[in-house]
């Protein structure tokens, strides 16, 4: 690990609808401890001295973003949300280029509904990847026994978990390399669910940096309830 952390840009794709939450609004705008999930997800970056700027990708008809206090922060720029996550991130990278970012600059992509990122995890990621030739991501080793299912919903095998990790965010890559990888995936109709997948498809191996298991992504109602109870206990 190094003492001087590298400067970085952050990208938050926030154009999704979060259908599994069955809420009255996209999940990134649900409330947690007086702020939206998106605001909490931004806070860890906005409070970091090495931040150069943030791009948030939002849906064209998003009625919620303009009402957030952080929407007027001069460090935050907006990009058009796309049909898929990869489209939204690629649009954000184009905005970074327009802001003068270089291909060699580090970009950290973070989920809009992952509000519990610890500053210590962010610093660890920046420190451990500062000189890495590829980049990498926060991740957590699998803890539970994993089962592979057949087409009838029955167990077909028990998976060796010793080499299995859960991919978290932020995911940290050089701007130019990430731009090329995502663009190539879109042209080739390759479906990627995170930025590391695109880098992998380009033939590179991202590094896994172990983070905290409580850096969860809110996907279902019980995730948000768990965070509310946890945060209430901190007060």
Curated annotation (Swiss-Prot):
GO molecular function: 2-C-methyl-D-erythritol 4-phosphate cytidylyltransferase activity
A GO BP entry: isopentenyl diphosphate biosynthetic process, methylerythritol 4-phosphate pathway
Annotated site residues (Transition state stabilizer) in this chain: 20, 27
EC id: 2.7.7.60
Catalytic reaction list: 2-C-methyl-D-erythritol 4-phosphate + CTP + H(+) = 4-CDP-2-C-methyl-D-erythritol + diphosphate
Top-level enzyme category: transferase
CDD domains: CDP-ME_synthetase
Keywords, sorted A to Z: Isoprene biosynthesis, Nucleotidyltransferase, Transferase
Coiled-coil region list: none
Pathway: Isoprenoid biosynthesis; isopentenyl diphosphate biosynthesis via DXP pathway; isopentenyl diphosphate from 1-deoxy-D-xylulose 5-phosphate: step 2/6
Origin: domain of life: Bacteria
Pfam families attached to this UniProt entry: IspD (PF01128)
Chain positions of site Positions MEP for the nucleophilic attack: 161, 217
Family: Belongs to the IspD/TarI cytidylyltransferase family. IspD subfamily.
Function comment: Catalyzes the formation of 4-diphosphocytidyl-2-C-methyl-D-erythritol from CTP and 2-C-methyl-D-erythritol 4-phosphate (MEP).
Protein name: 2-C-methyl-D-erythritol 4-phosphate cytidylyltransferase
Organism: Pseudomonas putida (strain ATCC 47054 / DSM 6125 / CFBP 8728 / NCIMB 11950 / KT2440)
Gene this chain is encoded by: ispD
């Amino acid at each position: 690990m190094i003492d001087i952390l590298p400067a970085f840009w952050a990208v938050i794709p926030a154009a999704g609808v979060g259908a599994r939450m069955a809420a009255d609004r996209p999940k990134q705008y649900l409330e947690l401890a007086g702020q939206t999930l998106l605001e909490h997800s931004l806070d860890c970056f906005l409070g970091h001295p090495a931040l150069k700027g943030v791009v948030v990708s939002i849906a064209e008809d998003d009625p919620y973003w303009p009402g957030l206090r952080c929407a007027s922060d001069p460090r935050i720029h907006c990009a058009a949300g796309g049909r898929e996550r990869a489209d939204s991130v690629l649009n954000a990278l184009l905005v970074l280029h327009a802001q003068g970012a270089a291909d060699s600059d580090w970009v950290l992509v973070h989920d809009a509904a992952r509000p519990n990122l610890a500053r210590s995890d962010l610093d660890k990621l920046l420190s451990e990847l500062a000189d890495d030739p590829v980049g990498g991501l926060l991740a957590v080793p699998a803890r539970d026994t994993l089962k592979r299912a057949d087409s009838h919903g029955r167990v077909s095998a028990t998976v060796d978990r010793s080499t299995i990790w859960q991919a978290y965010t932020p995911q940290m890559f050089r701007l130019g390399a990430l731009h090329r990888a995502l663009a190539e995936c879109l042209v080739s109709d390759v479906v990627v669910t995170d930025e590391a997948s695109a880098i992998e498809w380009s033939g590179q191996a991202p590094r896994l940096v172990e983070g905290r298991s409580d850096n969860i992504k809110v996907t279902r109602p019980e995730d948000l309830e768990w965070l509310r109870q946890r945060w209430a206990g901190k007060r």
